[in-house]
Amino acid sequence: MTDTQNRVAMGYIKGVFGIKGWLKIAANTEYSDSLLDYPEWHLVKDGKTISVTLEAGKVVNGELQVKFEGINDRDLAFSLRGYTIEIPREAFAPTEEDEYYWTDLVGMTVVNKDHTVLGKVSNLMETGANDVLMIDGEHGQILIPFVSQYIETVDTGSKTITADWGLDY
């Protein structure tokens, strides 16, 4: 797996703040300030990748703002607008047993107890009560709550999820 394939998009740079190189971030994480846990970021746009080091960060009125080493003025900061923020997957904190990062579930094949392939996980959605797998396959889109009542096993090695779910549900 190449370095690029092993990185996860975590948000993007949506604008600048002030004149000293601060940037506004749109985070694709549950808690926007969790991006501050990663000192090294990869910024990607139009096939170009820039590696940057986080100098400082803060949440102001619910908005994540960051400062990178070497980015000290508004013009240079503005040139980074629109870049996607990627973090190496191996930098993520380990999960507890039966806990998974969404990025690890996307792309997994979902089969039911009859070994019928339901499709692949294309995305997940948060409903408040629980997360829901969005599965795309030859049977159309299937939504399965990601709870133990329906999910029997998650095998990260074989990238397979076994669900107690019929085609007629």
From Swiss-Prot:
Biological-process GO terms, alphabetical: maturation of SSU-rRNA
Family matches, as PANTHER family: RIBOSOME MATURATION FACTOR RIMM (PTHR33692:SF1)
Key words of the record: Chaperone, Cytoplasm, Ribosome biogenesis, rRNA processing
Described function: An accessory protein needed during the final step in the assembly of 30S ribosomal subunit, possibly for assembly of the head region. Essential for efficient processing of 16S rRNA. May be needed both before and after RbfA during the maturation of 16S rRNA. It has affinity for free ribosomal 30S subunits but not for 70S ribosomes.
Family classification: Belongs to the RimM family.
Gene3D superfamilies for the chain: PRC-barrel domain, RimM
Domain notes: The PRC barrel domain binds ribosomal protein uS19.
Xref: NCBIfam families: 16S_RimM (TIGR02273)
UniProt keyword annotation of Protein biosynthesis present: no
Molecular-function GO terms, alphabetical: ribosome binding
Domain PRC barrel, chain residue ranges per copy: 97-169
Quaternary structure and interacting proteins, as annotated: Binds ribosomal protein uS19.
Subcellular location: Cytoplasm
One CC-aspect GO term: ribosome
Protein name: Ribosome maturation factor RimM
